[in-house]
Amino acid sequence: MTISSAILLGIVQGVAEFLPISSSGHLAILQNLFDLSAGEDHMFFDVLLHLGTLISICVCYWGDIVAMVREVFIVLRGGRRADGTLVQGNLGAARLFMMIVVGTLPLFLVLPINDKVEELYYITPFIGVALLLTGCMLFVSDKMTPGTRTERNMRFRDALVVGLCQCVATIPGLSRSGTTITAGIATGLDRRFAMKYSFLLSLPAVLGANLLSFIKAIGEETVDASLIPAYLLGMLAAMLSGIAAISLMKLIAKKSKFGWFAYYCWGAGILTIILSLIF
């Protein structure tokens, strides 16, 4: 693992995690077709890359995260300050927190088959087909009429539908952000809120996946200390490119142009299938 390859993988992770083009699919393609990976320490490096994108979300949605954490502490204190006086809560933040919890619950369905899902990362033609499906989904999403629901009137069933779609998007090549944003729009969410909910919903998913990967990495891998600088630079690249990608997505959401990415996914999917047959 060289510094340049670590930075490249970090940029790919940060950009593809938030643009609806599938970060898992792109990283798998780079590894399978071009042998560009972290080598024996790949699991530890993956943890750092996802940590970088997690920081990106925290930076871009810091206000929402602080508001939700504040609401949790208000509830734990029975709605009162330390001196016993009542606190005026933030209904939107409280409901958003509940919807993230509900949307995260379906991920437990994936745990028993997680090893089977990971095997798909090594089937390059399958990833190409999944990218084609992602393109179709994004194309359709732009044809949908978005609703008006936000955190204040989002329903529990909306959160469950988006959460179930997030489970499906664990398949490499299917974009998590694209799948969950499209699902949110389909259930009647406002387009910009659907994007915000999608990104915030990834926080517990990334934290949980990172925790499992970290425990597994500690038990199975010995990290090469000489590669730590490259890994940290890769994480920094993932964080910075992630912030840029989220900012771009906010602009695109205003113009309702997620379908632009459909053409990229179709091209990437076709190219992936062709290259997998050649190599």
Segments (PLM) and residue ranges:
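Multi-pass membrane proteins that catalyze or facilitate reactions on polyprenyl-/lipid-phosphate substrates
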Residues: 1-279
